[in-house]
């Protein structure tokens, strides 16, 4: 069982798990190196469940704002280190465990192995050092009395003193496999099977003594009992999104990092312009996501080395973390902020992301369920170290385009509705890209409504002599550019998607209701887990930046965010005012009860990550657009006045008289509402007043809880194998279709219920259709585009 792909499921736990892991290790030739230690051993621990959190909170009360002293302003983020190995792991390793105990690491070894595969591509070497492995250590100590899962005890308290120093009485930090940089990824669950292979009491609880810790399932978002089947998965995805969505403290911390780097840039080039792009601009970032910056100026060549020296001089970044990738497609500087451990990628004169950011934000408005899928999929790939191209995964831009294409071409549902089942969509996404999609012959097209096209057709428009890659995605903004051309590990991603489909489809099947652990185990937790390191890191951020959330001084006037709760019976009401001449926009959370209110003074450019720029998108020229994200705590929203009524959105154009059954234009048959009514969906309308330079009004709605589908696991794209669909002539008057069917949803109207009429009625003559046109409410067949 590959620890990078699959986990031991709750029903599979037993005494033979450790033996099966050893058999897999022997068959793969793993662990036969010089040290005899498994290089993929997981360094992170699963997070405590919400039910067990009070005990952990009690132990960490002094550091969390209790009677103890407050953390120092200069204290680094928690950096837990491992101690003794679990008994189950020692049994699984056998003779390798003795080598693991004697395993030491010198600074020279850390220096030589700390360079990533990105440096190998660029041909540049940075001064190597590793603060987490600078001292010679051993993995286990006989008298330590600490278990492998005691990370949270040391992580709950911020360690004072300089970085790299080991406090007295605490286990030294060690990096097991720096070549893969597992230690830098706090969310990594690589090798989690070793922690799951032993008995639950010995492995997850650290023994059965009185001081044993609570079980760590790694599902801190699970705070209630969910419905059975696919409906429960839908509810759990919503809770996961609300739990992992960025909080105002995290946004404030990232703005401070940007401000420090911007100060260094302004000292060098006073006329330079520093802008933000990437997930920070769109709000689709995880707690450990990086920050992408672009510096605009007048240079013939990007001054990478000059900025690198300035960053070292001002001690902005960890000296060992600064890497210059000057041989990449787009030269960038990669660094890690010294105070917050946030990774930052800096590029020069890269304006490609401006249009890409607007493109993704427009689709986020069009598909209100898109952010939920993206956040789950990002976490799914991040914990498996498949979220970047140079680590063998795919870029976030490729992932977003795949999700957009999936929603565009879904044959049965209208993805623009806010009451679709997220659990159904997630399972079908894994089924499509894990099993059904033909990566060898098919490419993905997003523009013009979306389509699946042959790679031969894409190759005709390819530039620079490139051939279509395994994961071929046509760039919707740059024709001829293949977004996934550098994703050499696309088949690995396909494998994990297939694994996720198998696990989730079994978990939501009717047979799963007979499992003895059906009420205690998390369905989403079978494929996604949150580590305790991420939880401690977020708690440290909230403690340190909780008192710094103030209105941004860069805004001209105060911004008041207003919220009005209404009910819209499952329909999403979207209305917004024209944007200002300064092209500043407001990005709001689509589901969280906390609206975004803390202003960001930095500008956004794109939703691409640093690896996307490095490998996927060639540079182009386009005007700069300043963006920022606003967030607000829930307590502030209760005292704000209600918003004024806002006009409805632009109505959809009238449908044409020809129905083309292709991937671009699809036939949708409305289904009569179920007998069990769906509860009205609370919708929030948020308006922004106060300045003339900022005008944005968005409707924010939480996805409703739809009724369970009778066939939740059918293939989502069975109707898209043909590229040239037949045309059906629609005779008679079609003027009445504009007010009903599919087009009425886009204009904010309520869709009237339509009976389930058979297809034989469409063979009527034209005069009879005209005669009864005024008696119909709407046609059961509506045109999508």
UniProtKB/Swiss-Prot annotation:
A Pfam family (short name) is: MTPAP-like_central
Cofactors demanded by this protein: Mg(2+); Mn(2+)
Subcellular localization: Cytoplasm; Nucleus, Nucleoplasm
Residue ranges constituting the PAP-associated domain according to the UniProt record: 421-480
Q: Name one GO molecular function term.
A: poly(A) RNA polymerase activity
Enzyme class, one word? transferase
Compositionally biased tracts (Pro residues): 68-85
Could you name the Gene Ontology cellular component terms for this entry? Golgi apparatus; nuclear membrane; nucleoplasm
A biological process (GO) annotation for this entry? Answer: response to xenobiotic stimulus
SUPFAM superfamilies for the chain: Nucleotidyltransferase (SSF81301), PAP/OAS1 substrate-binding domain (SSF81631)
Q: Which residues hold ATP?
A: 353, 378, 396-397, 481, 485
What keywords does the record list, in alphabetical order?
Answer: ATP-binding, Cytoplasm, Magnesium, Manganese, Metal-binding, mRNA processing, Nucleotide-binding, Nucleotidyltransferase, Nucleus, Transferase
> Which transformation does this protein catalyse, written as a reaction?
RNA(n) + ATP = RNA(n)-3'-adenine ribonucleotide + diphosphate
Q: Where is the composition biased (Basic residues)?
A: 757-774
Composition-biased stretches, type Low complexity, lie in 86-98, 106-145, 593-611
Chain segments carrying region Disordered: 56-184, 593-625, 731-785
State the EC number(s). Answer: 2.7.7.19, 2.7.7.-
Q: Where does Mg(2+) bind?
A: 290, 292
Similarity remark: Belongs to the DNA polymerase type-B-like family.
Q: State how it assembles.
A: Component of a nuclear TRAMP-like complex, an ATP-dependent exosome regulatory complex consisting of a helicase (MTREX), an oligadenylate polymerase (TENT4B or TENT4A), and a substrate specific RNA-binding factor (ZCCHC7 or ZCCHC8). Several TRAMP-like complexes exist with specific compositions and are associated with nuclear, or nucleolar RNA exosomes.
Q: What does this protein do?
A: Terminal nucleotidyltransferase that catalyzes preferentially the transfer of ATP and GTP on RNA 3' poly(A) tail creating a heterogeneous 3' poly(A) tail leading to mRNAs stabilization by protecting mRNAs from active deadenylation. Also functions as a catalytic subunit of a TRAMP-like complex which has a poly(A) RNA polymerase activity and is involved in a post-transcriptional quality control mechanism. Polyadenylation with short oligo(A) tails is required for the degradative activity of the exosome on several of its nuclear RNA substrates.
Provide the protein name.
Terminal nucleotidyltransferase 4A
Species assigned in the record:
Mus musculus
Traced from the root, the source organism's taxonomic lineage reads: Eukaryota, Metazoa, Chordata, Craniata, Vertebrata
Gene encoding it?
A: Tent4a
């Amino acid at each position: 069982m590959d620890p990078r792909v699959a986990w031991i499921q709750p029903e599979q736990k037993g005494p033979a798990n450790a033996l099966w892991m050893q058999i897999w290790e022997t068959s793969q030739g793993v662990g036969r190196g010089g040290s005899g230690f498994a290089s993929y051993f997981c360094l992170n621990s699963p997070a405590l469940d919400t039910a067990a959190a009070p005990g952990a909170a009690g132990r960490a009360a002094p550091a969390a704002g209790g009677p103890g002293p407050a953390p120092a302003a200069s204290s680094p983020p928690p950096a837990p280190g491992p101690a003794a190995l679990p008994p189950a792991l020692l049994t699984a390793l056998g003779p390798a465990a003795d080598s693991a105990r004697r395993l030491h690491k010198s600074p020279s070894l850390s220096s030589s192995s700390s360079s990533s595969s990105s440096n190998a591509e660029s041909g540049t070497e940075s001064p190597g050092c590793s603060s987490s492995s600078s001292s010679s250590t051993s993995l286990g100590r006989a008298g330590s009395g600490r278990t492998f899962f005691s990370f949270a005890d040391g992580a709950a308290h911020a360690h004072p003193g300089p970085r790299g120093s080991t406090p007295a009485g605490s286990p030294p930090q060690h990096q097991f496999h720096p070549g893969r940089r597992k230690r830098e990824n706090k969310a990594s669950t690589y090798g989690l099977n070793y922690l799951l292979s032993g008995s639950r009491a010995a492995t997850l609880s650290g023994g059965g003594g009185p001081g044993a810790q609570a079980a760590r399932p790694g599902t801190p978002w699970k705070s209630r009992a969910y419905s059975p089947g696919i409906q429960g998965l839908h509810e759990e995805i919503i809770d996961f999104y609300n739990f992992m969505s960025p909080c105002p403290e995290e946004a404030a911390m990232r703005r401070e990092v940007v401000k420090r780097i911007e100060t260094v840039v302004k000292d060098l080039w006073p006329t330079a312009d520093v802008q933000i792009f990437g997930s920070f601009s769109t709000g689709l970032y995880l707690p450990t996501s990086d920050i992408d910056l672009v510096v605009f100026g007048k240079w013939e060549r990007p001054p990478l080395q000059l900025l690198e020296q300035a960053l070292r001089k001002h001690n902005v970044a960890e000296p060992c973390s600064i890497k210059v990738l000057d041989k990449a497609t787009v030269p960038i500087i990669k660094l890690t902020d010294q105070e917050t451990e946030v990774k930052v990628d800096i590029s020069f004169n890269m304006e490609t992301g401006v249009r890409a950011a607007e493109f993704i934000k427009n689709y986020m408005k069009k598909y209100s369920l898109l952010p939920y899928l993206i956040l789950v999929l990002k976490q799914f790939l991040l914990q498996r170290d498949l979220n970047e191209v140079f680590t063998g995964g795919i870029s976030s831009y490729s992932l977003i385009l795949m999700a957009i294409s999936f929603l565009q071409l879904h044959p049965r549902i209208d993805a623009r509705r806010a009451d679709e089942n997220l659990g159904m969509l997630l399972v079908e996404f894994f089924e499509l890209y894990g099993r059904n999609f033909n990566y060898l012959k098919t490419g993905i097209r997003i523009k013009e409504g979306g389509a699946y096209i042959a790679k031969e057709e894409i190759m005709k428009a390819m530039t620079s002599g490139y051939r279509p890659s395994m994961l071929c995605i046509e760039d919707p903004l740059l024709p001829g550019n293949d977004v996934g051309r550098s994703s050499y590990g696309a088949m690995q991603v396909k494998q994990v998607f297939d694994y996720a489909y198998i696990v989730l489809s079994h978990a939501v099947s009717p047979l799963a209701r007979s499992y003895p652990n059906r009420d205690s185990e998390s369905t989403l937790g079978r494929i996604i887990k949150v580590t305790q390191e991420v939880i401690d890191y977020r708690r440290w951020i909230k403690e340190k930046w909780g008192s710094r959330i103030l209105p941004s001084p860069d805004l001209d006037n105060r911004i008041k965010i207003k919220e009005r709760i209404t009910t819209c019976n499952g329909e999403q009401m979207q209305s917004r005012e024209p944007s200002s001449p300064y092209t500043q926009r407001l990005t709001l959370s689509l589901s969280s009860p906390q609206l975004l209110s803390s202003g960001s003074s930095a500008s956004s450019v794109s939703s691409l990550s640093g690896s996307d720029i490095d490998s996927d998108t060639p540079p182009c020229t386009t005007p700069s657009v300043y963006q920022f994200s606003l967030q607000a705590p829930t307590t502030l929203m209760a005292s704000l006045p209600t918003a004024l009524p806002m006009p409805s959105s632009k109505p959809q154009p009238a449908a044409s008289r020809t129905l083309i059954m292709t991937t671009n234009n699809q036939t949708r048959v409305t289904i009569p509402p179920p007998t069990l009514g769906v509860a009205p969906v609370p919708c929030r309308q948020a308006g922004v007043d106060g300045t003339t330079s900022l005008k944005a009004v968005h409707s924010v709605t939480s996805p409703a809880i739809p009724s369970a589908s009778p066939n939740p696991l059918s293939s989502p794209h069975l109707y898209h194998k043909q590229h040239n669909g037949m045309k059906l002539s629609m005779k008679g008057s079609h003027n009445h279709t504009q007010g009903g069917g599919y087009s009425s949803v886009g204009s904010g109207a309520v869709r009237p219920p339509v009976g389930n009429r058979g297809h034989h009625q469409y063979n009527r003559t034209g005069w009879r259709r005209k005669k009864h046109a005024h008696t119909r409410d709407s046609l059961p067949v509506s045109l999508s585009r």
